[in-house]
Each structure stands twice: as structure tokens, then as C-alpha cells.
Amino acid sequence: MKRNKGFTLIELIVSIFLFSILVFVAGGSFVGALATQRRALNMKKVEENGRFIIELMAREIRVANPINTSNSTCPGPSVLSFQHPVNGAIEYSVSNNQIQRRVGGVNTIISNPDVMVSRLNFCISGNSTGDDKQPRVTIILGLSSSSAQSEAIDLQTTVSQRVLSD
């Protein structure tokens, strides 16, 4: 009686083929998971930067002296100038896809260099003379990631001014 110990060549080829298919499937899912994680991190960075920008603007607009310019069309201009009681004249605008804050003649970029600003508009209402409405400014902000996997987000908030008088 003849006993065969070991595998035949065909069994070996079939097992290698099945193993290689499993490796390719596992590798593909791993690469997909990494791409998804990168996209999520880009989105998080864009969102955090947008929240920071809007919060900074909102804090200063909230306590500013009444903004005298009004616009009936919304979205309005992409530049907002106002008088802050402590910091003086402040202006927000977009320059080279970055948000620029001008205080006392000094320009400062307040957005992350990895985040591109696609839109910045201000809608001002309730500040006309004889108007009994609460003055408010709506900030509309569009941001996207500057990476190859561009993630875009649109943010909007409305800030009511605290008209503080002496």
C-alpha cells in the first residue's frame, strides 16, 4: 500500500490563489478605510476652523457700535467694517482665499492656510433709523479644504447686536 504524505501541486496552487484573493480584499478595504479617515480629518479641520472664524466675528459684532450700513439684498457684501468699543475700527474681508481681519491698520489672516474661503457674505438688517427691530448681522461662510480630497462646508449664523450706550 502506497501512502501519500503531502500536497499535490494543484492543491498548493489553489490554496495560494485563495490566500492571495483574501490578501487583496483585506488590503483594499484597509486602503479604503485610510482614505475615509483622511476625508473625515479634512472635514473636521475645515469645520473647526469655520467655527473659530464665526465665533471670533460674532463676539466682536455682538458688542460693536451700531453698524450704519444696511443692505436689502442678501447675500450682501463680502466686507464688513464696524467700530468696536475696545479695539476700534475692525474690518473683515477675503483676500487670496483667506479671511483677513484688519484692526488699527494691521492685517491679520485668521483662517487656517490649509482651508480655502470660497464665500464670505454679510447680511445686515434692523439698523435703519426709525426701525424698531433689533440690529443683527447674518454671516454666511463657505470653506473648503485645500487638499486633493477637497471637503467643503457652508456655515451661517445670525448675530444680534447688543446696542450698549453710555
Model-flagged regions — what are they?
Residues 3-55:
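Aliphatic-rich helix starts adjacent to a transmembrane/signal segment
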Residues 36-37, 52-72:
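Alpha-helix exit/C-cap motif
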Residues 3, 84, 145:
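Acidic surface patches and DE-rich sequence motifs
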